[in-house]
Amino acid sequence: MLSIIVPSYNRKAEVPALLESLTQQTSSNFEVIIVDDCSKERVVVEQSYSFPVTVIRNETNQGAAESRNVGARTSKGDWLLFLDDDDCFMPEKCEKVLQVIEQNPNINFIYHPAKCEMVNEGFTYVTQPIEPQEISTERILLANKIGGMPMIAIKKEMFLKIGGLSTALRSLEDYDFLLKLLQEPSFTPYKINEPLTYCTFHTKRSSVSTDTTNTQKAIDYIREHYVKTVEQARNFDINASYILAYPHIMNLSRKAAKYYFDIFKKTKSIKQFIITLVILISPKLAINLKRLGK
């Protein structure tokens, strides 16, 4: 059985739609664990579904990382999936994950692309994760080319073995989790080559904060714990600039240009110089470069 873990904080209204979307799964061999992170309005599920639903409420606000850890420790399934309350799984996701697990008994990690919608810009794109044989600490320090928590499945035993998500961080917890996973010698990944999660992104959303204090702390933490070589340091310096640019570009702020210019100086890439100029002209136009696969 699969366990789908959903952290929720002050988004009670999103929960019914999320559960309704899971009724479309072509396999119902899963449970759902909603971890209410001490929301102002308690999450209550009164409707019954074809799959078991458990709601756990944290007594104090713990953050998304510890909420996922709580769900994992409580879960009854052998494999863990993670879903945020503003994303959804494709109808065939659970069935395909279960098939892969059955056909590949030695694996302990599954990942796949996501279909992403830029809501305000009116277009979608599909992420392009790297192949299992390409995964290395060096490669992931350069960019997270695996995906976030809604794009992975992990054997519960492996999740607990590496200690789950770090509660020392309030940003980049999923990225840190992948890097920690790569340090485990028994890590055995498998890639499904089709998008099985649908994610939505909104530019100029009030929840996208440009305060990068927690992000900078997470960057420093990751540098201290995973960067060991000159190549790793160079790769992560480049990625840190991308990470710091993200909230600014999502807020359509020209401040993102500073970070892309930093990347240009580090890489001497003409592409990054052009992106810098595009951001200075129009951050919205820079977002639309994804429409062209740039």
Swiss-Prot record:
- Gene Ontology MF annotations: glycosyltransferase activity; hexosyltransferase activity
Q: Which Pfam families match?
A: Glycos_transf_2
Q: Does the keyword Transferase apply?
A: yes
Q: What is its EC number?
A: 2.4.-.-
Q: What domain of life does the native source organism fall in?
A: Bacteria
Key words, A-Z: Glycosyltransferase, Transferase
Q: Which GO terms describe its biological process?
A: biosynthetic process
- What family does this belong to? Belongs to the glycosyltransferase 2 family.
Protein name as catalogued? Uncharacterized glycosyltransferase HI_1696
